[in-house]
Amino acid sequence: MSQVSRRKVLFVTSELADLVKTGGLGDVSAALPRAMRHLHDVRVLIPGYPQVINSGNPIHIISQLGGHAALPPCKVGRMDMKDGLVIYVLICPELYEREGTPYADSDGRDWSDNHIRFARLGLAAAEFAAGEVKSQWCPELVHAHDWPAGLAPAYMRWRGQSTPSIFTIHNLAYQGTVSTASSRELGIPDEAITPEGMEFYGKLSFIKAGMAFASHITTVSATYAREITTPEFGCGLEGFLQSKANKGQLSGIPNGIDESWDAATDEHLICHFAPNEWTRKEINADYVRELFELDASTGPLYAVVSRLVYQKGLDLTIGVAEHIVNNGGQIAIIGRGEPEEEDAMRELAARFPGRIGVRIGFNETDARRMFAGSDFLLMPSRYEPCGLSQMYAQRFGSLPVARNTGGLADTIEDGVTGFLFKESTIESYTEALNRTFQVFAHRELLNAMRCRAMAAPFNWHQAVEPYADLYRDLLKKNVSISSNY
């Protein structure tokens, strides 16, 4: 990594695992700023959801911001986390203080004004970068994450700001599209509603706005960065992304996982263990079997820890479940998501009582215990930008069985730390599962693979170094541009 000077960086995100999260975005938004802090002064801007306002962390109001078009006025508060991370909270009760998730109500219906809610977040980031927030701290670079923050680089560009920006794609399939009729209420200039701007098949796309107007685009694995330039994974944006890649404006930087994922120290586990302490790992397995009402067994235990959505390939797991059970295996499933996927999981468990168990919902403690207690993690994703679960599992000696795509391809060494299969078919998946049966029957090989998996270097240093280099390059270019005025 090249030498860098300490600069001010604002992360813009809709989730932060400390306070509110629905998936990997929240984990990354919490971990990466902390990993970067020894190099830069990194702070985070997030909406003031009830989970944030009521977190027990004091919030001190530092500024008021006016409205713009249909975007209402709001306040900015500062929250200092116990470890020193500074969080700026965008306080606007009419937009954010609602029961449910950051994106949907308690029944899972998307908020009808999400375009207003997250446009306000993007505008606040631009106002921050322009020095309009009354604070002694002003970012020199803005790093926006996924579609909810997509308008941050866009508003910065439309307002004529020279502050460089990065837009990170965590999942291209979630694009934040809205009717072009909303352009006036969002204050979007007509010249931005073009194929080169944020127009996408007759609609406005927040994720495309981020990609179009940011100084640089990243995504969360090298393989996914290549995949999204192809029709199979590009979600209709492959041509646009290929043009960015051709200009050197698209790169893949892998996520890491934090140091709490350590089987020897994790406070959530029933029993700590180190490599080769497999009888202690079995104590965690016994807990998982009891939690999911599975029969006592010495056969392989497979875990599913996932959002229950089509992307995750859960229909494939349903298709191979009987094969797993017939070979002496059991499956424990935890997650929440689309109602039809949740119902399918319940029906699967009902078909195989004592062999397959499901818990709809998500609990961090139980998820960690599942990684620690299982022998294998099932992850047949149709696509996976990065994925974190396969890294969590390996750290706890659970070998992932995953499709060879995106970040899964980059973080699993086939036959060494896990099992990869190529096609998104039951046949290809079954071939990989047959290999798990063979390995499980040969304990010396199983334990050797577990040891290699637990030693895999999934830390944030792998992401910090390339991001630090990218920050330096963008800030250097910005100085050169500014000096020409």
Curated annotation (Swiss-Prot):
GO biological process terms on file: glycogen biosynthetic process
Pathway: Glycan biosynthesis; glycogen biosynthesis
Pfam families linked: Glyco_transf_5, Glycos_transf_1
Annotated positions binding ADP-alpha-D-glucose: K21
Catalytic reaction equation(s): [(1->4)-alpha-D-glucosyl](n) + ADP-alpha-D-glucose = [(1->4)-alpha-D-glucosyl](n+1) + ADP + H(+)
Function: Synthesizes alpha-1,4-glucan chains using ADP-glucose.
Family, as annotated: Belongs to the glycosyltransferase 1 family. Bacterial/plant glycogen synthase subfamily.
Protein name: Glycogen synthase
Organism of this sequence: Pseudomonas savastanoi pv. phaseolicola (strain 1448A / Race 6) (Pseudomonas syringae pv. phaseolicola (strain 1448A / Race 6))
